[in-house]
């Protein structure tokens, strides 16, 4: 009897683990997005990684099974860190790939906003930026503005990848 009482919990654990099996894919019924991206980066080259966050949301919702038209999505990207140098016209050659990606999304309706206070700190005026950029008075006030209008706040976090997927799998 004692042996049975000791082995019963182990047996139940094994059965429950077997019964659970593999994970389950859930097709969440996402509505068209209303999102504001808060981009404040320590290094302007991190903009490439931050734009993957925009791409991830945009592509998920414009492809099957959702198939939303770009005009159904309401996406705003607010730049107010070192990355604002990437959208200064004089730096276009240096950040060409990032500028082209932002222009592509801007042409599809994504709004790209730059904090006017940050621009001033960097010595930029409105005329210094790419033609798809809108300069707003203040990034923090702008974030509050969009959130009060029902936009979800997304803050890209950029980490240095130290291990490959194969190393940690």
PLM feature segments, named:
Residues 41-52, 71, 92, 96:
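Soluble non-cytosolic domains of exported or imported proteins
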Residues 88-169:
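A cross-taxonomic marker for long C-terminal extensions/tails that follow the last structured domain
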Residues 48-68:
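Histidine-anchored nucleotide/phosphate-binding helix
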Residues 68-87:
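Acidic helix-start/capping segments at beta-turn-to-alpha-helix junctions
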Residues 11-19:
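Hydrophobic h-region of N-terminal signal peptides that target proteins for export
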Residues 29-42, 79-84:
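Acidic/histidine-rich, surface-exposed loop or edge segments in extracytoplasmic proteins
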Residues 35-38, 76-79, 111-114, 154-155:
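Structural recognition of the beta-strand scaffold that forms the well-ordered cores
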Residues 2-10:
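Sec-dependent signal peptide recognition
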